[in-house]
Protein backbone atom coordinates (compact mmCIF):
# COMPACT_ATOMS: atom_id res chain seq x y z
CA UNK A 1 0.00 0.00 0.00
CA UNK A 2 1.27 3.46 -0.80
CA UNK A 3 -0.16 6.58 0.75
CA UNK A 4 0.58 10.01 -0.63
CA UNK A 5 -0.26 13.49 0.53
CA UNK A 6 -1.01 16.08 -2.08
CA UNK A 7 -0.08 18.99 0.18
CA UNK A 8 3.70 18.34 0.04
CA UNK A 9 6.09 20.92 -1.21
CA UNK A 10 9.46 22.48 -0.52
CA UNK A 11 8.03 25.82 0.48
CA UNK A 12 10.08 28.10 2.67
CA UNK A 13 9.50 28.01 6.42
CA UNK A 14 8.40 30.90 8.60
CA UNK A 15 9.16 31.28 12.29
CA UNK A 16 5.73 30.11 13.40
CA UNK A 17 5.63 26.89 11.40
CA UNK A 18 9.25 25.77 11.13
CA UNK A 19 9.34 22.08 10.52
CA UNK A 20 12.23 19.86 11.29
CA UNK A 21 13.70 19.41 7.83
CA UNK A 22 16.07 16.68 8.91
CA UNK A 23 13.16 14.73 10.34
CA UNK A 24 10.84 15.17 7.41
CA UNK A 25 13.48 14.17 4.88
CA UNK A 26 13.84 10.72 6.43
CA UNK A 27 12.00 7.49 5.66
CA UNK A 28 9.06 7.75 8.04
CA UNK A 29 6.99 4.67 9.04
CA UNK A 30 3.33 5.53 9.28
CA UNK A 31 0.54 3.31 10.53
CA UNK A 32 -2.46 3.86 8.29
CA UNK A 33 -4.43 0.89 9.52
CA UNK A 34 -4.24 -2.31 11.49
CA UNK A 35 -1.42 -4.51 10.30
CA UNK A 36 -0.25 -2.06 7.64
CA UNK A 37 3.19 -0.57 8.18
CA UNK A 38 3.95 1.78 5.37
CA UNK A 39 7.22 3.48 4.65
CA UNK A 40 6.92 6.55 2.50
CA UNK A 41 9.27 9.30 1.48
CA UNK A 42 8.02 12.43 3.19
CA UNK A 43 9.44 15.85 2.36
CA UNK A 44 8.73 19.28 3.70
CA UNK A 45 4.98 19.57 4.07
CA UNK A 46 3.08 22.46 2.54
CA UNK A 47 3.26 25.11 5.26
CA UNK A 48 0.06 26.71 4.07
CA UNK A 49 -1.71 23.39 4.64
CA UNK A 50 -0.21 23.16 8.12
CA UNK A 51 -1.23 26.71 8.95
CA UNK A 52 -4.76 26.02 7.75
CA UNK A 53 -4.85 22.89 9.89
CA UNK A 54 -3.62 24.73 13.00
CA UNK A 55 -6.09 27.52 12.32
CA UNK A 56 -8.91 24.99 12.30
CA UNK A 57 -7.73 23.62 15.63
CA UNK A 58 -7.44 27.16 16.98
CA UNK A 59 -11.01 28.06 16.07
CA UNK A 60 -12.72 24.72 16.74
CA UNK A 61 -10.90 23.46 19.84
CA UNK A 62 -9.28 26.32 21.77
CA UNK A 63 -12.49 28.35 22.32
CA UNK A 64 -14.20 25.31 23.83
CA UNK A 65 -11.28 24.55 26.14
CA UNK A 66 -10.94 28.22 27.08
CA UNK A 67 -14.64 28.31 27.97
CA UNK A 68 -14.21 25.17 30.07
CA UNK A 69 -11.24 26.61 31.95
CA UNK A 70 -12.93 29.99 32.39
CA UNK A 71 -15.73 28.37 34.38
CA UNK A 72 -13.27 26.01 36.07
CA UNK A 73 -11.38 29.00 37.45
CA UNK A 74 -14.56 30.96 38.11
CA UNK A 75 -16.25 28.23 40.16
CA UNK A 76 -13.06 27.70 42.16
CA UNK A 77 -12.37 31.32 43.07
CA UNK A 78 -15.85 32.87 43.21
CA UNK A 79 -15.83 32.54 47.01
CA UNK A 80 -13.37 35.45 47.11
CA UNK A 81 -15.96 37.63 45.36
CA UNK A 82 -18.69 36.23 47.62
CA UNK A 83 -16.66 37.13 50.70
CA UNK A 84 -16.71 40.80 49.75
CA UNK A 85 -20.53 40.57 49.88
CA UNK A 86 -20.57 39.11 53.38
CA UNK A 87 -20.81 35.38 52.64
CA UNK A 88 -18.57 34.49 55.57
CA UNK A 89 -20.69 36.55 57.99
CA UNK A 90 -23.98 35.15 56.67
CA UNK A 91 -22.70 31.59 57.17
CA UNK A 92 -21.40 32.35 60.65
CA UNK A 93 -17.68 31.95 59.95
CA UNK A 94 -15.46 32.81 62.92
CA UNK A 95 -11.70 33.17 63.30
CA UNK A 96 -9.78 31.55 60.47
CA UNK A 97 -12.66 29.39 59.19
CA UNK A 98 -12.62 31.19 55.83
CA UNK A 99 -8.95 30.22 55.41
CA UNK A 100 -9.77 26.63 56.36
CA UNK A 101 -12.61 26.59 53.83
CA UNK A 102 -10.20 27.76 51.11
CA UNK A 103 -7.66 25.12 52.17
CA UNK A 104 -10.02 22.12 52.14
CA UNK A 105 -10.48 22.46 48.38
CA UNK A 106 -6.84 21.58 47.68
CA UNK A 107 -6.71 18.26 49.55
CA UNK A 108 -8.95 16.26 47.15
CA UNK A 109 -7.69 18.46 44.33
CA UNK A 110 -4.25 16.89 44.75
CA UNK A 111 -5.23 13.41 45.92
CA UNK A 112 -7.59 12.77 43.01
CA UNK A 113 -5.63 14.32 40.14
CA UNK A 114 -3.26 11.41 39.60
CA UNK A 115 -5.80 8.54 39.61
CA UNK A 116 -8.33 10.59 37.62
CA UNK A 117 -5.71 11.26 34.92
CA UNK A 118 -5.92 7.63 33.80
CA UNK A 119 -9.53 8.20 32.79
CA UNK A 120 -8.30 10.40 29.94
CA UNK A 121 -6.26 7.61 28.41
CA UNK A 122 -8.99 5.05 29.03
CA UNK A 123 -12.07 6.96 27.85
CA UNK A 124 -10.66 10.01 26.05
CA UNK A 125 -10.20 13.57 27.30
CA UNK A 126 -13.02 14.86 25.09
CA UNK A 127 -15.50 12.73 27.05
CA UNK A 128 -14.11 13.02 30.57
CA UNK A 129 -13.54 16.80 30.58
CA UNK A 130 -17.24 17.67 30.05
CA UNK A 131 -18.17 15.18 32.78
CA UNK A 132 -15.90 16.97 35.24
CA UNK A 133 -17.34 20.30 34.08
CA UNK A 134 -20.87 19.09 34.83
CA UNK A 135 -19.67 18.03 38.26
CA UNK A 136 -18.02 21.28 39.31
CA UNK A 137 -20.96 23.25 37.88
CA UNK A 138 -23.28 21.24 40.11
CA UNK A 139 -21.05 21.92 43.13
CA UNK A 140 -21.13 25.65 42.40
CA UNK A 141 -24.93 25.50 42.43
CA UNK A 142 -24.80 23.68 45.76
CA UNK A 143 -22.73 26.49 47.29
CA UNK A 144 -25.78 28.75 47.03
CA UNK A 145 -27.75 26.36 49.26
CA UNK A 146 -25.33 25.88 52.15
CA UNK A 147 -26.36 27.23 55.54
CA UNK A 148 -23.21 26.99 57.64
CA UNK A 149 -19.48 26.36 57.74
CA UNK A 150 -19.84 22.56 57.70
CA UNK A 151 -22.01 22.62 54.60
CA UNK A 152 -19.58 24.82 52.71
CA UNK A 153 -16.67 22.58 53.72
CA UNK A 154 -18.43 19.53 52.28
CA UNK A 155 -19.26 21.26 49.00
CA UNK A 156 -15.73 22.62 48.61
CA UNK A 157 -14.33 19.10 49.13
CA UNK A 158 -16.37 17.69 46.26
CA UNK A 159 -15.61 20.77 44.15
CA UNK A 160 -11.90 20.01 44.61
CA UNK A 161 -12.47 16.44 43.43
CA UNK A 162 -14.37 17.60 40.34
CA UNK A 163 -11.73 20.15 39.33
CA UNK A 164 -8.67 18.05 40.22
CA UNK A 165 -7.86 16.57 36.81
CA UNK A 166 -9.23 19.28 34.50
CA UNK A 167 -5.99 21.15 33.85
CA UNK A 168 -3.80 18.04 33.34
CA UNK A 169 -6.48 16.68 31.02
CA UNK A 170 -6.54 19.78 28.86
CA UNK A 171 -2.74 19.94 28.61
CA UNK A 172 -2.64 16.26 27.64
CA UNK A 173 -5.46 16.75 25.11
CA UNK A 174 -3.70 19.67 23.39
CA UNK A 175 -0.48 17.68 22.99
CA UNK A 176 -2.39 15.29 20.72
CA UNK A 177 -3.18 18.11 18.29
CA UNK A 178 -0.21 20.52 18.38
CA UNK A 179 3.56 20.31 17.92
CA UNK A 180 5.84 21.13 20.82
CA UNK A 181 6.86 24.48 19.32
CA UNK A 182 3.20 25.40 18.80
CA UNK A 183 2.06 24.52 22.29
CA UNK A 184 3.02 27.46 24.52
CA UNK A 185 0.93 30.10 22.78
CA UNK A 186 -2.07 27.75 22.60
CA UNK A 187 -1.78 26.91 26.27
CA UNK A 188 -1.45 30.64 26.93
CA UNK A 189 -4.77 31.30 25.22
CA UNK A 190 -6.29 28.54 27.32
CA UNK A 191 -4.72 29.77 30.57
CA UNK A 192 -5.73 33.35 29.77
CA UNK A 193 -9.28 32.21 30.39
CA UNK A 194 -8.42 32.03 34.10
CA UNK A 195 -7.46 35.71 34.07
CA UNK A 196 -10.55 36.53 32.06
CA UNK A 197 -12.59 34.61 34.63
CA UNK A 198 -11.27 36.94 37.34
CA UNK A 199 -12.32 39.93 35.26
CA UNK A 200 -15.65 38.36 34.31
CA UNK A 201 -16.26 37.27 37.89
CA UNK A 202 -15.52 40.77 39.14
CA UNK A 203 -17.89 42.36 36.62
CA UNK A 204 -20.61 39.80 37.29
CA UNK A 205 -20.25 40.25 41.04
CA UNK A 206 -20.39 44.02 40.60
CA UNK A 207 -23.74 43.67 38.82
CA UNK A 208 -25.23 40.89 40.94
CA UNK A 209 -24.36 42.58 44.23
CA UNK A 210 -26.55 45.50 43.20
CA UNK A 211 -29.58 43.19 43.43
CA UNK A 212 -31.60 44.24 46.46
CA UNK A 213 -34.78 42.95 48.01
CA UNK A 214 -34.72 39.35 46.78
CA UNK A 215 -35.15 36.27 48.93
CA UNK A 216 -31.49 35.38 48.52
CA UNK A 217 -28.28 37.22 49.27
CA UNK A 218 -26.20 38.63 46.42
CA UNK A 219 -23.49 36.01 46.85
CA UNK A 220 -26.12 33.24 46.51
CA UNK A 221 -27.33 34.66 43.21
CA UNK A 222 -23.70 34.75 42.09
CA UNK A 223 -23.24 31.02 42.75
CA UNK A 224 -26.54 30.15 41.05
CA UNK A 225 -25.77 32.11 37.89
CA UNK A 226 -22.20 30.86 37.51
CA UNK A 227 -23.05 27.25 38.37
CA UNK A 228 -26.05 27.16 36.04
CA UNK A 229 -24.14 28.53 33.06
CA UNK A 230 -21.29 26.08 33.74
CA UNK A 231 -23.72 23.17 33.67
CA UNK A 232 -25.21 24.22 30.32
CA UNK A 233 -21.81 24.85 28.71
CA UNK A 234 -20.62 21.38 29.74
CA UNK A 235 -23.39 19.81 27.68
CA UNK A 236 -22.44 21.87 24.62
CA UNK A 237 -18.74 20.98 24.96
CA UNK A 238 -19.56 17.28 25.25
CA UNK A 239 -21.46 17.43 21.96
CA UNK A 240 -18.92 19.51 20.01
CA UNK A 241 -15.38 18.70 21.26
CA UNK A 242 -13.64 16.20 18.91
CA UNK A 243 -12.37 12.99 20.48
CA UNK A 244 -9.22 12.93 18.29
CA UNK A 245 -7.88 14.11 14.95
CA UNK A 246 -9.20 10.92 13.37
CA UNK A 247 -12.78 11.66 14.45
CA UNK A 248 -12.78 15.44 13.94
CA UNK A 249 -15.64 16.01 11.49
CA UNK A 250 -14.32 19.45 10.51
CA UNK A 251 -11.18 17.91 8.95
CA UNK A 252 -10.83 16.36 5.51
CA UNK A 253 -9.24 12.91 5.16
CA UNK A 254 -6.05 14.55 3.92
CA UNK A 255 -5.97 16.91 6.91
CA UNK A 256 -6.49 14.00 9.31
CA UNK A 257 -3.49 12.20 7.81
CA UNK A 258 -1.41 15.37 7.97
CA UNK A 259 -2.43 15.97 11.60
CA UNK A 260 -1.48 12.43 12.60
CA UNK A 261 1.89 12.63 10.85
CA UNK A 262 2.72 15.94 12.53
CA UNK A 263 2.26 14.55 16.01
CA UNK A 264 3.93 11.22 15.26
CA UNK A 265 6.95 13.10 13.98
CA UNK A 266 7.05 15.57 16.85
CA UNK A 267 6.02 13.37 19.77
CA UNK A 268 6.33 9.71 20.70
CA UNK A 269 6.58 7.09 18.00
CA UNK A 270 2.90 6.24 18.17
CA UNK A 271 -0.01 8.48 19.06
CA UNK A 272 -2.19 5.62 20.20
CA UNK A 273 0.37 3.82 22.35
CA UNK A 274 -1.02 1.86 25.29
CA UNK A 275 -0.74 3.40 28.71
CA UNK A 276 1.82 1.57 30.83
CA UNK A 277 1.71 2.60 34.49
CA UNK A 278 5.12 1.10 35.25
CA UNK A 279 6.77 2.69 32.24
CA UNK A 280 5.15 6.06 32.84
CA UNK A 281 6.64 6.31 36.35
CA UNK A 282 10.18 6.22 34.92
CA UNK A 283 9.73 9.89 34.02
CA UNK A 284 10.49 10.73 37.66
CA UNK A 285 13.90 9.03 37.62
CA UNK A 286 15.71 12.00 36.08
CA UNK A 287 16.83 14.77 38.50
CA UNK A 288 15.40 17.43 36.18
CA UNK A 289 11.91 16.00 36.80
CA UNK A 290 12.31 16.62 40.53
CA UNK A 291 13.48 20.19 39.91
CA UNK A 292 10.44 20.79 37.69
CA UNK A 293 8.12 19.56 40.43
CA UNK A 294 9.82 21.85 42.95
CA UNK A 295 9.50 24.70 40.45
CA UNK A 296 5.78 24.00 40.08
CA UNK A 297 5.39 24.16 43.85
CA UNK A 298 7.37 27.39 44.23
CA UNK A 299 5.49 29.17 41.45
CA UNK A 300 2.16 27.85 42.69
CA UNK A 301 2.21 30.22 45.67
CA UNK A 302 2.16 33.51 43.69
CA UNK A 303 -0.44 32.08 41.30
CA UNK A 304 -2.79 30.92 44.06
CA UNK A 305 -2.28 34.11 46.05
CA UNK A 306 -3.56 36.06 43.05
CA UNK A 307 -6.43 33.64 42.36
CA UNK A 308 -7.65 33.50 45.96
CA UNK A 309 -6.81 36.90 47.40
CA UNK A 310 -6.78 39.58 44.67
CA UNK A 311 -10.17 41.03 45.75
CA UNK A 312 -8.92 41.32 49.34
CA UNK A 313 -5.62 42.88 48.20
CA UNK A 314 -7.55 45.47 46.17
CA UNK A 315 -10.04 46.05 49.01
CA UNK A 316 -7.15 47.09 51.28
CA UNK A 317 -6.94 50.32 49.24
CA UNK A 318 -10.24 51.43 50.74
CA UNK A 319 -12.75 50.58 48.01
CA UNK A 320 -16.33 49.60 48.85
CA UNK A 321 -17.53 46.00 48.59
CA UNK A 322 -19.13 46.58 45.18
CA UNK A 323 -16.33 48.73 43.75
CA UNK A 324 -13.65 46.30 44.92
CA UNK A 325 -14.94 43.69 42.48
CA UNK A 326 -14.98 46.25 39.68
CA UNK A 327 -11.39 47.30 40.41
CA UNK A 328 -10.13 43.70 40.05
CA UNK A 329 -11.16 43.65 36.38
CA UNK A 330 -8.30 45.71 34.91
CA UNK A 331 -5.42 43.80 36.62
CA UNK A 332 -7.01 40.50 35.56
CA UNK A 333 -7.34 41.58 31.92
CA UNK A 334 -3.79 42.91 31.98
CA UNK A 335 -2.59 39.55 33.30
CA UNK A 336 -4.29 37.77 30.40
CA UNK A 337 -2.61 40.08 27.87
CA UNK A 338 0.83 39.65 29.42
CA UNK A 339 0.32 35.91 29.53
CA UNK A 340 -0.10 35.89 25.74
CA UNK A 341 2.87 38.22 25.27
CA UNK A 342 5.22 36.05 27.34
CA UNK A 343 4.03 32.89 25.59
CA UNK A 344 4.48 34.31 22.09
CA UNK A 345 7.96 35.58 22.98
CA UNK A 346 8.85 32.15 24.36
CA UNK A 347 7.68 30.39 21.19
CA UNK A 348 9.48 32.93 19.01
CA UNK A 349 12.76 32.50 20.91
CA UNK A 350 12.24 28.71 21.23
CA UNK A 351 13.23 29.16 24.86
CA UNK A 352 11.20 28.70 28.04
CA UNK A 353 13.73 29.36 30.81
CA UNK A 354 14.71 32.97 29.99
CA UNK A 355 11.11 34.08 29.51
CA UNK A 356 10.07 32.26 32.69
CA UNK A 357 12.61 34.24 34.72
CA UNK A 358 11.31 37.51 33.24
CA UNK A 359 7.69 36.60 34.05
CA UNK A 360 8.41 35.48 37.62
CA UNK A 361 10.54 38.56 38.30
CA UNK A 362 7.70 40.86 37.24
CA UNK A 363 5.25 39.23 39.64
CA UNK A 364 7.77 39.16 42.48
CA UNK A 365 8.44 42.89 42.07
CA UNK A 366 4.70 43.55 42.26
CA UNK A 367 4.36 41.81 45.62
CA UNK A 368 7.47 43.55 46.99
CA UNK A 369 6.29 47.02 45.90
CA UNK A 370 2.79 46.54 47.32
CA UNK A 371 4.13 45.27 50.63
CA UNK A 372 6.75 47.98 51.10
CA UNK A 373 4.71 51.18 50.62
CA UNK A 374 1.96 53.00 52.47
CA UNK A 375 -0.92 51.90 50.26
CA UNK A 376 -3.44 54.46 51.53
CA UNK A 377 -1.11 57.35 50.70
CA UNK A 378 0.03 55.86 47.39
CA UNK A 379 -3.15 54.40 45.87
CA UNK A 380 -1.88 54.76 42.30
CA UNK A 381 1.39 52.94 42.96
CA UNK A 382 -0.40 50.25 44.97
CA UNK A 383 -2.88 49.65 42.18
CA UNK A 384 -0.05 49.53 39.63
CA UNK A 385 1.64 46.88 41.80
CA UNK A 386 -1.51 44.74 41.36
CA UNK A 387 -0.91 44.87 37.60
CA UNK A 388 2.66 43.66 38.13
CA UNK A 389 1.45 40.81 40.35
CA UNK A 390 -0.94 39.50 37.70
CA UNK A 391 1.46 40.09 34.78
CA UNK A 392 3.67 37.08 35.36
CA UNK A 393 1.77 34.78 37.73
CA UNK A 394 -0.24 32.89 35.12
CA UNK A 395 2.52 33.09 32.50
CA UNK A 396 4.95 31.27 34.78
CA UNK A 397 2.47 28.42 35.22
CA UNK A 398 1.84 28.16 31.48
CA UNK A 399 5.50 28.15 30.51
CA UNK A 400 6.43 25.63 33.20
CA UNK A 401 3.73 23.17 32.07
CA UNK A 402 4.76 23.67 28.45
CA UNK A 403 8.44 23.26 29.31
CA UNK A 404 8.22 19.80 30.81
CA UNK A 405 5.70 18.69 28.19
CA UNK A 406 8.17 19.81 25.50
CA UNK A 407 10.83 17.62 27.07
CA UNK A 408 8.58 14.59 27.76
CA UNK A 409 7.65 13.33 24.27
CA UNK A 410 6.47 9.88 25.42
CA UNK A 411 2.67 10.13 25.66
CA UNK A 412 2.18 7.98 28.77
CA UNK A 413 4.95 9.70 30.72
CA UNK A 414 3.68 13.10 29.64
CA UNK A 415 0.16 12.35 30.88
CA UNK A 416 1.42 11.12 34.25
CA UNK A 417 3.96 13.90 34.77
CA UNK A 418 1.35 16.56 33.99
CA UNK A 419 -1.13 14.92 36.36
CA UNK A 420 1.44 15.22 39.16
CA UNK A 421 3.07 18.56 38.30
CA UNK A 422 -0.08 20.64 37.88
CA UNK A 423 -1.72 19.48 41.15
CA UNK A 424 1.52 20.17 43.03
CA UNK A 425 1.33 23.77 41.84
CA UNK A 426 -2.27 23.97 42.98
CA UNK A 427 -1.69 22.32 46.34
CA UNK A 428 0.38 25.37 47.19
CA UNK A 429 -2.99 27.03 47.51
CA UNK A 430 -2.81 25.53 51.00
CA UNK A 431 0.13 27.83 51.63
CA UNK A 432 -1.51 30.92 50.17
CA UNK A 433 -4.74 30.16 52.04
CA UNK A 434 -2.96 30.15 55.39
CA UNK A 435 -0.41 32.94 55.04
CA UNK A 436 -3.13 35.56 54.45
CA UNK A 437 -4.16 35.56 58.11
CA UNK A 438 -7.08 37.64 59.48
CA UNK A 439 -4.79 39.33 62.01
CA UNK A 440 -2.61 40.66 59.17
CA UNK A 441 -5.52 42.29 57.34
CA UNK A 442 -5.96 44.51 55.46
CA UNK A 443 -2.46 44.71 53.96
CA UNK A 444 -1.20 41.17 54.72
CA UNK A 445 2.48 42.19 54.74
CA UNK A 446 3.86 38.81 55.93
CA UNK A 447 1.90 37.00 53.22
CA UNK A 448 3.20 39.35 50.53
CA UNK A 449 6.79 38.78 51.68
CA UNK A 450 6.40 34.99 51.75
CA UNK A 451 4.83 35.02 48.29
CA UNK A 452 7.70 37.08 46.90
CA UNK A 453 10.15 34.66 48.54
CA UNK A 454 8.60 31.69 46.76
CA UNK A 455 8.91 33.66 43.51
CA UNK A 456 12.63 34.09 44.18
CA UNK A 457 12.97 30.35 44.82
CA UNK A 458 11.22 29.71 41.51
CA UNK A 459 13.75 31.89 39.70
CA UNK A 460 16.65 29.92 41.21
CA UNK A 461 15.09 26.61 40.16
CA UNK A 462 14.40 27.80 36.60
CA UNK A 463 17.95 29.09 36.29
CA UNK A 464 19.35 25.79 37.59
CA UNK A 465 17.30 23.75 35.11
CA UNK A 466 18.27 26.02 32.21
CA UNK A 467 21.97 25.87 33.02
CA UNK A 468 21.88 22.08 33.35
CA UNK A 469 20.09 21.68 30.03
CA UNK A 470 22.47 24.02 28.23
CA UNK A 471 25.60 22.20 29.39
CA UNK A 472 24.05 18.74 28.99
CA UNK A 473 23.19 19.57 25.38
CA UNK A 474 26.77 20.77 24.86
CA UNK A 475 28.12 17.57 26.45
CA UNK A 476 26.02 15.45 24.11
CA UNK A 477 27.18 17.51 21.12
CA UNK A 478 30.83 17.04 22.07
CA UNK A 479 30.37 13.31 22.61
CA UNK A 480 28.84 12.87 19.14
CA UNK A 481 30.97 15.45 17.38
CA UNK A 482 27.92 17.22 15.95
CA UNK A 483 25.88 20.18 17.10
CA UNK A 484 22.16 19.43 17.45
CA UNK A 485 19.06 21.11 18.83
CA UNK A 486 15.82 19.50 20.00
CA UNK A 487 14.48 19.96 16.45
CA UNK A 488 17.19 17.73 14.99
CA UNK A 489 16.29 14.63 17.02
CA UNK A 490 14.57 11.93 14.97
CA UNK A 491 11.21 10.57 16.04
CA UNK A 492 12.45 7.15 17.13
CA UNK A 493 14.81 8.73 19.66
CA UNK A 494 12.27 11.00 21.30
CA UNK A 495 10.29 8.40 23.22
CA UNK A 496 13.34 7.25 25.22
CA UNK A 497 13.95 10.75 26.53
CA UNK A 498 17.31 11.75 28.07
CA UNK A 499 18.45 8.10 28.24
CA UNK A 500 19.08 8.23 24.49
CA UNK A 501 22.40 9.96 23.60
CA UNK A 502 20.70 11.60 20.60
CA UNK A 503 18.18 13.39 22.84
CA UNK A 504 18.44 17.18 23.15
CA UNK A 505 16.70 19.38 25.71
CA UNK A 506 14.21 22.06 24.74
CA UNK A 507 15.64 25.04 26.60
Swiss-Prot record:
Keywords: Endoplasmic reticulum, Membrane, Transmembrane, Transmembrane helix, Transport. The keyword Ion transport does not apply. The keyword Membrane applies. Residues 1-12 have a biased composition (Low complexity). It is a multi-pass membrane protein. GO terms for biological process: carboxylic acid transmembrane transport. Belongs to the major facilitator superfamily. Allantoate permease family. The chain crosses the membrane at residues 57-74, 100-120, 126-146, 157-177, 189-209, 221-241, 283-303, 326-346, 353-373, 379-399, 416-436, 445-465. InterPro entries: MFS, MFS_dom, MFS_trans_sf. Residues 1-20 are annotated as: Disordered. Signal peptide: none annotated. This is Uncharacterized transporter C1039.04. PANTHER family: PERMEASE-RELATED, TRANSPORTER, PUTATIVE (AFU_ORTHOLOGUE AFUA_2G00840)-RELATED. GO terms for cellular component: endoplasmic reticulum; membrane; plasma membrane. One of its GO terms (molecular function) is transmembrane transporter activity. It holds the Pfam family MFS_1. It is found in: Endoplasmic reticulum; Membrane. Coiled coil: none annotated.
